[in-house]
Amino acid sequence: MRALITFALLCLLYITVQGKVSTPKVHVYSHFPGEYGKPNTLICYVSSFHPPDISIELLKNGQVMSDTKQTDLAFEKGWQFHLTKSVAFTPEKGDEYTCSVRHMKETKKFSWEPNM
């Protein structure tokens, strides 16, 4: 009987965790301060999301950038997840760099601000 109650509680916990949807928090930044014509690394850090149904793309002027690197999916306390995607780039005046994040069925874009 004790095992049955424990199993039921674990099932309830699993259903509760699986049913909770957390919208991702997104930060787009560069490794060094943005300077036009200077090599840098564009980084998109996505955190605090659940479930882990997510895809991240780095875009230059709306086109997917090649040679990107992505960390393995990792989880935080509360079964929320985080990922980082990055790419080497050299910002040029007039170019727009964005991070496109699709979580579940919703896609949002976040822009890199060079602060120049």
From Swiss-Prot:
**What top-level branch of life does the organism fall under?**
Eukaryota
- Keywords assigned by UniProt? Disulfide bond, Immunity, Immunoglobulin domain, MHC I, Secreted, Signal
| Intrachain S-S bonds | C44-C99
Organism the protein comes from: Danio rerio (Zebrafish)
Its family?
Belongs to the beta-2-microglobulin family.
Domain spans labelled Ig-like C1-type? 24-111
The protein's name in its UniProt record: Beta-2-microglobulin
* UniProt KW Hydrolase keyword: no
Q: Which PROSITE patterns match?
A: IG_LIKE, IG_MHC
According to its UniProt entry, the protein's GO biological process terms are: antigen processing and presentation of exogenous peptide antigen via MHC class II; antigen processing and presentation of peptide antigen via MHC class I; immune response; peptide antigen assembly with MHC class II protein complex; positive regulation of immune response; positive regulation of T cell activation
Name of encoding gene: b2m
What functional role does this protein have?
Component of the class I major histocompatibility complex (MHC). Involved in the presentation of peptide antigens to the immune system.
Q: Give the matching PANTHER family.
A: BETA-2-MICROGLOBULIN, MHC CLASS II-RELATED
The answer to whether keyword Signal applies is yes
Q: How does it assemble?
A: Heterodimer of an alpha chain and a beta chain. Beta-2-microglobulin is the beta-chain of major histocompatibility complex class I molecules.
Assign the protein's first listed, main location to one coarse class: secreted
The protein's GO terms of the molecular function aspect are: MHC class II protein complex binding; peptide antigen binding
